[in-house]
Amino acid sequence: MYSGQTNLKDSVEYRPIDAGKLVLSPTRTYAPVIKKILSKYNSNEIHGMVHCWGGEHIKVIQFVDNSDVIKDNLFPVPPLFKLIQENSKTDWKEMYQVFNCGHRMEIYVPAEVAQDIIEISKSFNIDAQIVGRVEKSDSKKLTITSEYGKFEY
């Protein structure tokens, strides 16, 4: 049973499809991209990979010690997540904790490898960019800076 403010047939800002189709649109698989990356790079270059699904942005802090994972160049939040936030009135700190907000896959690599990983992704028509960095810290934490504020976890 659906009880949100937006009807499933309502149009969604900046999208040619209605809310129902937006919610039901398929998720892209990253398997071909990851396969190509792993055929070229090993654990010396790839320090970690996180699929942002279940635990979303905060999941990464399970895998670091004495590090601040700083995400300050995220992709724009897609209309679906804006719609969820507007209808639920969930604060953005919780949105980034619960939903990926359009940010789906993270690969932790040295800066000199990053551009090649981006080019591999783009060869599969998948947008990619450097979204942040990891810095030494006295504790483990995640800092997200977005158009909706700065959030620490």
Annotate each PLM feature:
Residues 1-153:
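Helix-biased detector of long, well-ordered alpha-helical tracts
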